[in-house]
Structure formats: C-alpha cells, structure tokens
Amino acid sequence: MASRGVNKVILVGNLGQDPEVRYMPSGGAVANFTLATSESWRDKQTGEMKEQTEWHRVVLFGKLAEVAGEYLRKGSQVYIEGQLRTRKWTDQSGQDKYTTEVVVNVGGTMQMLGGRQGGGAPAGGGQQQGGWGQPQQPQGGNQFSGGAQSRPQQQAPAAPSNEPPMDFDDDIPF
C-alpha cells in the first residue's frame, strides 16, 4: 500500500478572479480559477510583519464546476480538496510548456467559506442563524463534493429537534 503514494492537496484561500467555466464536447463543465493562500509572520530581526502569498491554479470538473461558476466570485473564500497534476501543452511557437494544477474531480471537495458576496442569494441556500436543533450543514448547504453526482450522500439519523442540550447537574465550576 505504501508503494502507491498519496496525492492529496487541501487549500483554503481566496479566488483571484471569477471562475472561467467552459463545457467539453461531452457536455461536462470545467471551471478554472486561481486561488491565493497567504501566511504571515513576524521577522525576528526587525520585528515587522511579513506576508507571503502563493497562487494556485485550480480546475474543477462536473457539477462542482457549475456550482463554482454560479456562486464563486473574485475574493470568495473557499476550501478545496483535490489532487496535484502537471500537464504538458504546446504554445503557439511550438515550445512544450508544463502547468501544475490542483484538480478537483469526483473524489474531491469544494466548500464555500465566509459570508455571501454582493447582494445575491446566500451561497448557503438560506441558512438560519442560531436555534437549537439546527442542522450542522445548512439545508441545500454550501458544501459540494465531486462524488455527490454519482453517489448519494449518507445522512446521519436525525437528533431530537428544538431542544437545548441537556443541563447536567455537576459540581464542576466551569
């Protein structure tokens, strides 16, 4: 098993531009965008804050691509789970070029994070705030998995709704 290796990429970042959605001859959607991830630290020598931003090319396929095209915009924060792929292509002058991308296929995940952008409908499909018994994932929620197209997602049994957590009578002061 160890000889096969693992190719899994997890990113949380912000879109650098609106997704570009195209359709293959087979009818399947493909979305491309760049994702910025940043880290910041304090320079030990000068004490000033430093920041480094990395840009990642992301490619989504199928239903995920359609969802990205409809709901994601420049600046949207998103969680991506996919695989690293390098593809070879030829430019107009005949030179071979290589591009490394994070590919989100059937087994991958894309989850929208943060609040809604602009004045459109909420990405979470009208999630409610607070209240006991609310589902952890909003109804029609904002998590999309590439596998959702080919296999139904298992639902956990429903917990008793509209009841606050049980109040335990114990002597612990916190």
From Swiss-Prot:
The keyword DNA damage applies. It comes from the Bacteria. GO terms for biological process: DNA recombination; DNA repair; DNA replication. Residues 110-174 are annotated as: Disordered. A motif (Important for interaction with partner proteins) lies at residues 169-174. Residues 134-160 have a biased composition (Low complexity). GO terms for molecular function: single-stranded DNA binding. Gene3D superfamilies: Nucleic acid-binding proteins. GO terms for cellular component: nucleoid. Residues 115-133 have a biased composition (Gly residues). Residues 6-111 form the SSB domain. Residues 55-61 bind DNA. InterPro entries: NA-bd_OB-fold, Primosome_PriB/ssb, ssDNA-bd. Keywords: DNA damage, DNA recombination, DNA repair, DNA replication, DNA-binding. PANTHER family: SINGLE-STRANDED DNA-BINDING PROTEIN. Homotetramer. Binds PriA via its C-terminus. Plays an important role in DNA replication, recombination and repair. Binds to ssDNA and to an array of partner proteins to recruit them to their sites of action during DNA metabolism. Stimulates the ATPase activity of PriA. One tetramer binds to 26 nucleotides (nt) of ssDNA, a 55 nt piece of ssDNA probably binds 2 tetramers. HAMAP family: SSB. NCBIfam families: PRK09010.1 (NF006533), ssb (TIGR00621). This is Single-stranded DNA-binding protein 1. It comes from Klebsiella pneumoniae subsp. pneumoniae (strain ATCC 700721 / MGH 78578). The lineage of its organism: Bacteria, Pseudomonadati, Pseudomonadota, Gammaproteobacteria, Enterobacterales. The gene is ssb1.
